[in-house]
Amino acid sequence: MLLLEHESKALLEKYGIKTAKCIFCETEEQAVKAAKEIGFPVVMKVAGREIVHKSDVGGVILNVKSEDEVREVFQRLMSIPKAEGVNIQPQLEKGIEVIVGVAENEQFGSVAMFGLGGVFVEVLKDVSFRLLPLTRRDAEEMVREVKGYKLLEGYRRVKGDVGAVVDLLLKLNEVVERESIVEMDLNPVFVYERGAVVADARIVVGERKRFDYTIPDLRDLFYPKSVAVIGASRTVGKPGFNIVWNLKQNGFMGKIYPVNPNADKILELKCYPSILDIPDEVDMAIIAVPAKIVPEVMAECAQKGIKGAVIVSSGFSEEGEKGAEYERRVLEIAKKHGIRIFGPNTTGVLNTENGFITSFAIQPVIKKGNIGIIAQTGLFLGIMMDIVTSNHPSIGFSKIVGMGNKIDVEDYEVLDFLLKDEQTKVIGIYMEGIKNGRAFYDVASSAEKPIVVFKSGRTEYGQKAAMSHTASICGDDDVFDAVCRQANLVRVYSFDELFDVTKAFSLQPLPKGDRVAIIHYTGSGCVQGSDAAYFAGLKLAEFSKDTVDKISEVTPEWHNVNNPIDIWPMVEYYGAFKAYQTAIEAVMEDEGVDSVIACVWANRLINADFEPDYKSLKKYGKPIYFCVEGARDVVFDHKNALELNGIPVYTNVINAVNVLGKVTKYAKRRIQS
């Protein structure tokens, strides 16, 4: 229900939010009396529950100065269709205009918005968002994030009370929760040097979206002792063959039972006509049969007493209503018998600890490591593993989960499992959509491990017919971006960046600060690195005298030691090994340096492809990244050598700095929380 403005302001005042109080008038005489009581000049506004935006219908009249003018304006406002009365309030001294709002998001629930008013919010979309409830840090960050923050800080002798704005945002927690508010526009709010006043308020109360969820233990789904492959095949290349082959190739530690009524053996494993014919207990089923048969197969799985299933088959809801009906039937059986399901339409699960893999795409033996992946695509247990193993030799995985259509197991459940998994140090997520966003946020915001997220579909806003400014400005991607900031998730925008950043977290320690030393073999690279550091939120470290003295020992007299270090003259005079080793050790020892980026030219002819003393680098407890440039074959060999010894390698200095910037920002927020 839409509250009238005087009702909205009375509600806000109840929670200590200062407003320009208004008097609701239904007659001309009431309006005249109210104006005299308030004192001229006054503001007069049309009031009506079916009038969405007063200004759109000419329903706001400022600077009304006399009794006669009150009478004329009252008649004009009451002639507006759906008018129920007129609100009269004092004409406020103009301050810095801001907008504060709340809207309901389908995935995440109540979202708070802040921005500067006027052109800043309407045209420039200079706004920030956070999920409710807000912490003080959330509110402070919301205010600082907008480009117009400089106006509040102080500009041309005009200054706003930032503390009052933060306090107003924090009061939203209680008022929204207690009063069941689904939409709120406080627009404008005038911010003065001391205090802030809500000049106009629009509030809708109703039933807020609730998010009920539980987080069961998924361990049995990753550690089965026996698995039935239903739809196993003797034909190389068919999904049913590839699944069995992958299980054997990756050394699955449990028992494998191929199910095929027309085969005796597949890859030397005995076949069974159905899962019910297997004499032993079966923990998991991998189902690779046509979608229309899957409900029947699930019924047999339920009869067998399995704990979980991975449905790799496609042809479900992604193909239309008929497929959606198959999903409903499958889920009904699963719920009734307590079976958890990954998929359908997925490559499923990988656990490198026990060799459990459900992919229907032939896979290489996947390296064990500390990266966990949650993906709404089959790519990760498909072609992506070929790309990773050939281009990123350092990357190893603990668990990979392809979510598919997500009819049962959801992202937040897998995320919770990986956060508790001892083999997983960093989590990478690829998502296209999210069902229970609030559950995902709740789990993610409690994480003590870095979470790197690549979400596609950024331009598909999926807006409903928005009835408030806040709802219309609050696009899905804006909200998701706010979720990432609020939960300290590292957001990336491509698969390449996903691997670059997870690799950094996987291989190197977190920086203790934002001061970076950059070493490059060209002056141009030094300039590019400096610019990139600024935009990535990093500071170029100031070297101590001791550091400068050490580096000067391998520096020609005519060359200055600065940060970034242009190392090429040193290489020419003293050789690559001595120049790089001296410079790297010096900056790593410097207490004023938190991280190091070293760039080398890999060229066999001039032997500039420096390879460091790996053991000595680890003792400093600081991250060091390399970028390697040059001839492709030499770069590949040199990159492999570095990464297999725990040093991440990037294509150029800008790439390396951007990754370090994201890692540093994560580390800084983690320390502050």
Swiss-Prot record:
ATP binds at A35, K36, E37, I38, G39, F40, P41, V42, V43, M44, K45, V46. The keyword Ligase applies. It holds the Pfam family CoA_binding_2. GO terms for molecular function: acetate-CoA ligase (ADP-forming) activity; ATP binding; metal ion binding. It is an enzyme of class 6 (ligase). Its EC number is 6.2.1.13. The keyword DNA repair does not apply. Keywords: ATP-binding, Ligase, Nucleotide-binding. Residues 9-45 form the ATP-grasp domain. Activity requires divalent metal cations. It catalyses: acetate + ATP + CoA = acetyl-CoA + ADP + phosphate. It comes from the Archaea. In the N-terminal section; belongs to the acetate CoA ligase beta subunit family. In the C-terminal section; belongs to the acetate CoA ligase alpha subunit family. Homodimer. Catalyzes the reversible conversion of a variety of acids to the corresponding acyl-CoA esters. Shows the highest activity with the aryl acids, indoleacetate and phenylacetate, as compared to acetate. In the reverse direction, phenylacetyl-CoA is the best substrate. Seems to be involved primarily in the degradation of aryl-CoA esters to the corresponding acids. Participates in the degradation of branched-chain amino acids via branched-chain-acyl-CoA esters. This is Acetate--CoA ligase [ADP-forming] II.
